[in-house]
Amino acid sequence: RTRAEIESMYWSICREVNSMAKTMKHMPDELRGLDKMLADKYFCNFSLFQSLPDAWAIDQLFPIVPIQRLDERPTRNATLQDITCDSDGKIANFVTNRQASHVLPVHSIKKNEEYYLGVFLVGAYQEILGDMHNLFGDTNAVHISVKDDTYHIDQIFDGETVEEVLDYVQYNPK
């Protein structure tokens, strides 16, 4: 019990120091990693190795943003984890406000809420590299064009079903 209380105090102090550090004109180097250390881990329903292999292999940055609750300012910071068997897929480098960051601004997740993030500028190259890693299959994809202040959904591509993915590896559950 005492250890849990001390750990709770430690994290509270870290959050307070981080909050104060953000107001400093010149932040000490020792405090620069607090944002990353305090970031939430958001587990996402995808495989990093399949969907964004260049983010894993060469640390390529892809624009990632929440695509809902756009009228609310994000109040949390997070890193992203995939849900593969080892949860080895982690994104901890992001583009925010035209600069690199170790955390992604996100909203607190509400009870029973499905929270969606969009990953942009991925393209077919990433899909070809990712192939069938972890048997996730192809994900749904959308082509959108933007002109002036409006957008148009040009095409919607359905992802693969579990049955289709299992068929690739000659598995027939019947």
Locate predicted features.
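Charged (often Lys/Glu-rich) extended helix/loop segments that serve as interaction or gating elements
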Residues: 1-174
